[in-house]
Amino acid sequence: MYQALRQATIDSYNRLIDIAINEEVDCVLLAGDLYDSPEGTLAEQFALVKGLERLDQAGIASFILFGNHDYKSQKEKHLALPASTRVFPRQVTTLEFTTARGDQVAITGFSYPKRWLTEDYSQYFPKRYNHVDYHIGMFHGQESQGNSQLDHYAPFQKSHLQQLAYDYWALGHIHAAQQLSEQTPIIYPGNIQGTHFKETGPKGGVLVSLEQGKDPIIESIETTDWQFKVHQAIAPPIHGVSDLQALFQKAYQAEVDQARAEGLHYVLRLHYRVDGSDSDSLAFWEDYAKDLFDQLQWQYQDQNDVFLADLRFEIKGSKRLDQASLYEQALMETLDHYQDPEAFDQVLNELLDHPLWQRHLQPAISLSQFQEDVLVATRNKILLSLYQK
């Protein structure tokens, strides 16, 4: 599955290039995190460069910057890029070019010098240039949350971006598509391929049309046919293993039918909320759900429409927490502490620095998804101990 998703990412990128060429755009902007690793593997670099070369052959300029995931990408460790591809350095810089129609365009941006940037780099962006027809900002970061423990990615204020009076802001970092402002288009297109269950739904880019005296035209474009999908439901009472089997099979078949109807492929998670006060049902979930799910994975392994990837069951209700022992209460407090990504990362420092992790596992694992999975499983264990008293 990992290899299939890697190929899906390349296919999605190539479709993006196809659309740019077919639409005869003036330029393509790639706002960081082109790679999942600090430097990018040679295979990843080759795929990127091949697409940029196609743009070059079509007479389309491309502008790229590196973000917090690929901050170590440097010229001497990277395959050569086409002449029409311009890379932003590690300080805020403005690059200019002229379109085929003769429009003068300025683009301001920067690449990350390190993984975390707590400084607001938007303060170094100049006001809109008066001598150009269009001024575009490229920025890899996120809105300031006013919390030093969370503001690690060049935190900015939306109001400040608006004050700079640019014609368009191409943002990177947030993997979900969202538009922060309409009057001045400030847009996260999201990533081009979901890689875990925090990145569900359609993925792609945006096609932006700017014309003086007119409102910008923003069009979302979908470029991937592999999507992550979460089937969420409240679990009914379970009276036997066959009930669990029927529940899983019915959910799976419904998703297969939908995938075929839409011409898509799903990576599927079954997510159920289980009533903790129903001790009989809870016992079946605890004792049989995982093994049964594994058997269904094997049964459906050759099914190409929907890959049955994951099962999560979450115990709902916490009415017995007041009956917890001091030890169990301390466990829950510790669990709350590790909701902070920085605290969670500190525990994993030795693992994350290990060469085998960085080489084989880091490209395939989302740390935020891993954190969520660990915390949910731990919470379930604590609640199970309470409900089984």
Feature annotation, model-predicted:
Residues E24, A106, D133, A165, ...:
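Short loop/turn motifs at secondary-structure junctions
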Residues T224-K389:
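Accessory, non-catalytic peripheral segments of nucleic-acid enzymes
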Residues M1-Q45, Q369:
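N-terminal active-site segment of His-dependent metallophosphoesterases
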Residues C27, P38-S209:
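His/Asp/Glu-rich metal-coordinating catalytic cores
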Residues D18-I21, E53, S159-Q162, Q253, ...:
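Surface-exposed alpha-helical segments enriched in charged/polar residues
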Residues T93-A100, P189-K250:
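Binuclear metal-dependent phosphoesterase catalytic core
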Residues S12-N22, E96-T98, Q123-R128, V256-A259:
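Short amphipathic alpha-helices and their capping/turn segments at secondary-structure boundaries
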Residues D33-S37, Q142-S144, D275-S277:
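A short, flexible beta-alpha/helix-coil linker loop
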